[in-house]
């Protein structure tokens, strides 16, 4: 396993070496976005605001993906033979390719130890937006805790993300309501590890929040002028997005660009609170992409705030949790209970083992299965068309949604449409 991790960075260093020629030729103002969840949504908000002034690292947030993006190449999503092409194409394109935009808005993942530092020490962003902190990809950091490098998973993951602020040149924007984030930045400043200004945002700016299956509005008090502004979205958005809107306003003030408040045409990546009309009048909210407790909790709080009858939850397992999967799925049950849903469908061995018993004890109507096909059968037999369905988690929920769409052609807007994902579903008999 250790060799595999070292090999990952050896190969990543090869691609970074060549991609750096294109990066230095371009010399953009780098705006880095990091965090456990919410990075892509933050990137989309920035994109709506800056438009064609920036290049955006869509579908690229790893050491490999960002190197490929630097020379306008896509990573490996299909045949493994593409690796041979990339080993040749990256050096060649690095000799002449150059992005032309003023800004590079780049999403940086902290999925594995040392990756954030690997990217931060290369890109050295002008601005970093650290949007969230939680136990996503916890299994990747367990060895560091076992080796005594950190006393807990929380501290190991915090340390990883904190590498970006250390290498940031001008401005670091964080969620000031997250204690571990605050402590990390206070420590970095006390040790003079960064000269960047640190601005801590909070949800205190929220004056009103209204959410429906296909619409959300916020009224936020401006951080700079104190004037209240209304933000509009044509999809359901969690209240936690207020932190990102406040961060966006802070960024806009720093860059001295025009702010934006109407996000009705905001295009989010698939599986991030997409609204669909379902068969026979069903309302479908697809939030199936991310499956970590921090994101599940946020979406369930949104669902609780939504004034609709007949709330049904379809929940898949939380993945990549390693030894803490039991406690995370027990916490998941507590969050589900707060929503008071009419019906809960749990899919996966983890939700069946850890979540279902707590929900049963609380008196909720639940249906558990390991097979998405059985879940579909239950839905088709029991839905009346008056329900609002929220999908969150793993276990091929995108396949379930596809079968319930009023307009089958809208399946192209669901997550995991790449060939490899389609093949995985087919192997499970999900055609």
Where are these regions (language model features)?
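Acidic, Mg2+-coordinating active-site environments of NTP-dependent enzymes
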Residues: 26-28, 100-101, 120-284, 308-309, ...
């Amino acid at each position: 396993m250790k060799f595999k991790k070292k090999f990952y960075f050896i190969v990543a260093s090869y691609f970074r070496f060549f991609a750096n020629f294109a990066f230095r030729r371009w010399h953009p103002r780098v705006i880095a976005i990091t965090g456990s969840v919410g990075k892509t949504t933050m990137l989309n908000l920035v994109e709506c605001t800056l438009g064609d002034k920036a290049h955006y690292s869509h579908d690229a947030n790893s050491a490999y993906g960002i190197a490929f993006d630097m020379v306008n190449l896509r990573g490996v999503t299909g045949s493994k033979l593409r690796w041979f092409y990339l080993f040749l194409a990256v050096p060649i394109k690095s000799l002449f390719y150059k992005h032309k935009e003023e800004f590079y808005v780049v999403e940086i993942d902290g999925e594995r130890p040392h990756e954030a530092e690997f990217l931060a020490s290369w890109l050295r962003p002008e601005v970093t937006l650290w949007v969230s902190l939680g136990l996503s990809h916890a299994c990747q950091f367990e060895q560091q805790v076992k080796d005594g490098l950190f006393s807990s998973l929380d501290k190991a993951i915090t340390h990883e993300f904190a590498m970006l602020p250390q290498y940031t040149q001008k401005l670091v924007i964080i969620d000031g309501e997250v204690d571990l984030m605050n402590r990390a930045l206070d420590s970095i400043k006390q040790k003079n590890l960064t000269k960047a200004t640190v601005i801590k945002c909070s949800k205190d700016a929220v004056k009103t929040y209204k959410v429906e299956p296909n619409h959300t509005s916020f009224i936020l008090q401006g951080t700079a002028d104190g004037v209240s502004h209304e933000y509009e979205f044509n999809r359901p958005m969690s209240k936690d997005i207020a932190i990102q809107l406040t961060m966006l306003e802070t960024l806009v003030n720093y860059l001295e660009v025009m702010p934006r408040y109407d996000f009705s045409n905001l295009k989010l990546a698939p599986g991030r609170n997409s609204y669909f009309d379902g068969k026979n009048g069903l309302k479908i909210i697809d939030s199936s992409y991310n499956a970590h407790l921090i994101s599940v909790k946020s979406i369930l709080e949104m669902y609780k705030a939504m004034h609709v009858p007949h709330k049904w939850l379809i929940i898949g397992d939380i993945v990549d949790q390693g030894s803490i999967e039991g406690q995370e799925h027990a916490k998941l049950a507590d969050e589900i209970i707060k929503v008071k849903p009419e019906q809960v469908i749990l899919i996966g061995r983890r939700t069946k083992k850890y979540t279902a018993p707590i929900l049963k004890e609380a008196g909720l109507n639940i249906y558990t299965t390991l097979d998405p096909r059985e879940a579909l059968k239950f839905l088709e037999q029991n839905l009346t068309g008056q329900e609002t369905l929220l999908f969150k988690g793993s276990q091929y929920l995108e396949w379930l949604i596809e079968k319930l769409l009023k307009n089958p052609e809208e399946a192209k807007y669901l997550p995991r449409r790449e060939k490899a994902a389609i093949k995985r579903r087919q192997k499970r008999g999900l055609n």
